[in-house]
Curated annotation (Swiss-Prot):
Binding-site positions, Fe cation: C26, C28, C48, C51
Protein name: Diphthamide biosynthesis protein 3
GO cellular component, one term: nucleus
Keywords: Iron, Metal-binding, Oxidoreductase
Gene (UniProt): dph-3
InterPro entries assigned: DPH3/4-like (IPR044248), DPH_MB_dom (IPR007872), DPH_MB_sf (IPR036671)
Gene Ontology biological process terms from the UniProt entry: protein histidyl modification to diphthamide; tRNA wobble base 5-methoxycarbonylmethyl-2-thiouridinylation
Pfam families named among the record's database cross-references: Zn_ribbon_CSL
Species name: Caenorhabditis elegans
Record's catalysed reaction(s): [3Fe-4S](1+)-[protein] + Fe(2+)-[Dph3] = [3Fe-4S](0)-[protein] + Fe(3+)-[Dph3]; 2 [3Fe-4S](0)-[protein] + 2 Fe(2+)-[Dph3] + NADH = 2 [4Fe-4S](1+)-[protein] + 2 [Dph3] + NAD(+) + H(+)
């Protein structure tokens, strides 16, 4: 069981589009981070790369559902 420094809503994070990572300030001076891919997988723990602190990210997993496209081997026939 992890001990969290805090619980923070995803809306309070900053999103780095270039790195596809959410950031939130850490008391040590660095930033907690969690990649969008981890949120899509249901992960809710952001770590600081400089210290041992963890925070729990509060978010709606449905907002991060990765939509998959399904390809069909047959072309779809148009109605005549």
């Amino acid at each position: 069981m992890s001990v969290f420094h805090d619980e923070v809503e995803i809306e309070d994070f900053e999103f780095d589009e270039e790195k596809d990572v959410y950031h939130y300030p850490c008391p040590c001076g660095d930033r907690f981070e969690i990649p969008r891919e981890m949120l899509e997988m249901g992960e809710d723990v952001a770590q600081c790369p400089s210290c041992s602190l963890l925070i729990r990210v509060i978010y709606d997993p449905e907002d991060f559902v990765k939509l998959e496209t399904i390809s069909t081997s047959k072309p779809i026939a148009e109605p005549v």
